Regions:
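Histidine/acidic-residue-rich catalytic or RNA/ligand-binding cores of hydrolases
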Residues: 66-70, 113, 139, 216-223, ...
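Divalent metal-binding pocket/active-site signature
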Residues: 165-243
Length: 353
């Protein structure tokens, strides 16, 4: 047995083993109904254990384009510029000990998963992207197929992104993002929520729904139940916009997540009050806090940086947490808000009624 033969055998074994490992990794990502991906958090760099998410912001934005579904596209901005401009904001966040970041820009509102992955790779922050469609603003951000297709067909589209990745990138959604109009839900709003519920039952992905108003929020919760989905998979986005605190308590008591995502330097006292109301009702374990901050706004010079329109992601770290401590919350209670709740909310798991 000569030296050359041994080298060739070793090379063949290396290739074989690499292929076997890759096959195993592929199986863990793409299986029947995506069930191999349960009990993890799916980031743009792949699955992580919930305990690795760390301090996290459950509702922020890197990039947004408000021009509308019929006009938006990657040709409207320079991806390299987006990364260059937004990178320092994420590094500021990382320097404050935050390692989890949920990007809530959906498809047709400038969801760019490649940009998110590049930022995640350069900062080490665990970034989540999404599947789903955004129906608020009277459907301005909905593609034509949403109107034409049934809830089942929409769910099939969104489930396919979970099973196969988004647009051939090999990047997978970590949750379902949708949105409805305020007040009574129209037929399209209802269809979007039905489709989101169907997608959850096939994937285990959490549903984050933009509402910000009591009637719509309660209607969304009811549809989720009607579809046989446990409310604990639903995040009521912009719950700080619900005027009646009793409605927030009602939603949280039903098991859904109440997301107070309007934290900024001017709303600290208000958000402390909202958090204490939920805490006194025994519902701190159903409460999320975030800032709805950022972002590179397509159409503005340098995404808005020139005019100081980009809001940093640091209000919770710099202002809300100290205010909560001053208000009497313990370190354990703050950890629940900032670490435990986001990880629990975004853990992939099918939850049926």
């Amino acid at each position: 047995m000569n030296k050359k033969f041994l080298i060739n055998v070793c090379l063949l074994l290396t290739v074989y083993c690499a292929g076997f490992v890759n096959a195993k990794q592929s199986i863990s990502i793409k299986t029947d109904g995506g069930q191999a991906k349960k009990n993890i958090i799916m980031t743009v760099r792949g699955p992580i254990k919930p305990g690795s998410f760390g301090k996290a912001l459950p509702h922020e934005h890197i990039l947004v384009d408000f021009i509308g579904a019929d006009k938006t596209g990657t040709g409207r901005y320079d991806a390299k510029e987006v990364v260059s401009i937004m990178l320092p904001y994420l590094r500021e966040l990382k320097n404050r000990g935050f390692t989890g970041f949920v990007d809530c820009s959906p498809a047709f509102l400038a969801r760019d998963v490649k940009v998110l992955k590049r930022l995640s790779e350069q900062t080490g922050i665990h970034i989540l992207t999404n599947t789903g469609c955004y129906g608020a603003n009277n459907g301005k951000y909905l593609p034509e197929y949403v109107i034409a297709e049934s809830a089942d067909q929409l769910a099939a589209r969104w489930t396919a992104e979970w099973e196969n990745g988004i647009e051939g990138t090999g990047i997978y959604p970590g949750f379902i993002k949708t949105a409805v109009n305020p007040g009574a839900l129209n037929d399209t709003d209802k269809k979007l929520i039905q489709a989101a519920a169907m997608t959850h039952l096939k994937t285990g992905l959490t549903i984050a729904c933009h509402t910000g108003q009591a009637q719509a929020a309660l209607a969304v919760l009811e549809i989720i139940r009607q579809q046989g989905v446990d409310p604990s998979t639903l995040i009521i986005v912009h719950a700080n916009g619900i005027a009646d605190p009793n409605v927030r308590i009602k939603i949280a008591a039903a098991g859904a997540w109440v997301e107070l995502d309007g934290v900024n330097k001017n709303s600290i006292a208000q958000n402390v009050q909202f958090i204490k109301e939920l805490m006194l009702a025994g519902l701190l374990n159903r409460t999320l806090v975030s800032q709805d901050a950022g972002w590179y706004n397509v159409g503005d010079e340098k995404g808005g940086q020139t005019d100081n329109k980009i809001r940093p992601f640091t209000a919770i770290a710099d202002q809300l947490i100290p205010a909560l401590k001053q208000a009497g919350l313990t370190n354990a209670q703050i950890r629940r808000l900032i670490v435990e709740n986001p990880a629990k909310a975004y853990t992939v798991k099918v939850k049926k009624l």
